[in-house]
Design a protein with these regions (language model features):
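...with weaker cross-activation on analogous glycine-rich loops/strands in unrelated enzymes
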Residues: 119-221
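Surface-exposed, short loops/turns at beta-strand junctions within beta-sandwich domains
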Residues: 328-338
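Aromatic/hydrophobic beta-strand junction motif of beta-rich domains
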Residues: 277-289
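Short, compositionally biased P/S/T/A/G/V-rich stretches that sit at domain boundaries
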Residues: 250-280
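Short beta-strand elements
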Residues: 349-361
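Extracellular recognition modules
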Residues: 340-346
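Aromatic sugar-binding surface patches on proteins
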Residues: 313-330
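N-terminal capping segments
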Residues: 2-117
Length: 361
């Protein structure tokens, strides 16, 4: 549970470290993101056209959907919930890089950030520039001497046998990673349950019968279930199919290295007030974990939002000046009346209302 402490000069939100089985904590968060139920206020289509991927997903008014929308803004469950009111999603745009939502890697990154501050920024694979985060199962060889951190799945295949990769798949457990990458493209899945390994009569791994179940955020509707969702939950892939598509078996070092999660803190260094807000917001937010979003709203006496500013789609951002919201809020142009101002700030673990008060123009 998040606690907000108020001092003379600042406000501090504490996000306690989660307790329990680390793998289950991560997997449960992915499940929650895949299961949120909503219906769109109006029909909208998320689009993106480019060499890396094409997105064309229409969400229809009157239909029920499950899971955070597929988009490129790296949102957490908490951020998505801010736009869902009484089960209705009020979308904020129709472009892939505008609509609040997440995609394959950002969903996994926010899930891993339940435990650690770096959850895959820059790629969900072992890299020298941020060591100690990910590692391959089964001591799979990394050809750093030839490619540095820019190695692809194809390079890993060139330097490791098929048996080595299969043995790596066999070691996968819940909340591990399956990652395919090549220059300019890739896809990542989270392991949903421990690998199911079948051996043939010679004691070798049977790649056609051995499977790994996953949970993944995708750019397509799941046609195998009766609900509307882009989240594939519990889908099984054979070792052969994973190998054919060059998915690398990866685990988080945190699961086994003896480290423990740390409490996270978000600090607002200057308090706004009913008298000062008329001149605009001031102060700076700093965080010990990556910020996911900051959302300022102004509601009228009827409870309707008349001004808002959403700062999001962050990559490794740890501080934000509230003055950056003033152009969106345009508080000096508010008509005379009574209003309520709220500032919500969040990391992957969740959000907290750092400020909320009534004021009069």
């Amino acid at each position: 549970m998040t606690n907000v402490t108020v001092t003379d000069n600042c406000k501090i939100a504490k996000f306690p470290a989660p307790e329990g089985d680390y793998r289950q904590i991560v997997l449960d968060y992915m499940k929650k993101m895949s299961q949120i139920k909503w219906t769109p206020k109006e029909t909208f289509t998320i689009t993106k056209k480019g060499p890396r991927s094409n997105v064309n997903l229409t969400y229809e008014k009157g239909k029920t959907y499950y899971g955070v929308t597929y988009s490129g803004t790296k949102c957490t469950l908490d951020q998505f919930e801010q736009l869902v009111h009484d089960g209705v999603f009020h979308n904020n745009g129709e472009y892939f890089d505008e609509v609040v939502g997440n995609h394959c890697s950002s969903s996994i990154s926010t899930a891993l950030q339940q435990l650690i501050s770096n959850g895959g920024i820059g790629g969900t694979k072992p890299q020298k520039w941020y060591p100690g985060i990910f590692k391959f199962t089964n001591d799979i060889k990394i050809p750093y001497e030839y490619f540095g951190d820019d190695y692809s799945s194809f390079d890993i295949w060139d330097f490791n046998s098929k048996l080595k990769i299969f043995e790596g798949y066999s070691l996968l457990k819940s909340a591990d990673i399956l990652y395919y990458c090549k220059p300019g493209a890739g896809h990542v899945r989270m392991v949903y349950g421990d690998a199911e390994v079948v051996y043939d009569e010679n004691g070798m791994i049977d790649g056609e019968k051995s499977t790994v179940s996953v949970i993944e955020q995708t750019n397509a509707w799941d046609k195998t279930v009766e609900v509307n969702t882009t989240w594939f939950v519990g889908r099984k892939y054979t070792f052969e199919k994973l190998y054919e598509k060059h998915f690398m078996p990866i685990t988080l070092e945190f699961y086994s290295n003896g480290d423990v999660p740390k409490d996270a803190y978000v600090i607002l260094d200057e308090k706004n007030s009913p008298s000062s807000i008329k001149g605009g917001l001031s102060g700076k937010i700093t965080s010990t974990f990556p910020l996911n979003y900051a959302y300022a709203t102004v509601k009228n006496s009827d409870g309707s939002i008349v001004r808002s500013s959403l700062k999001n789609n962050f990559t490794n951002v740890y501080e934000l000046k509230l003055a950056d919201m003033n152009s969106d809020l345009d508080l000096s142009s508010l008509a005379k009346g009574s209003y309520t101002y709220t500032l919500r700030v969040a990391i992957a673990r969740g959000g907290a209302d750092l400020e909320s008060f009534d004021f009069v123009i």
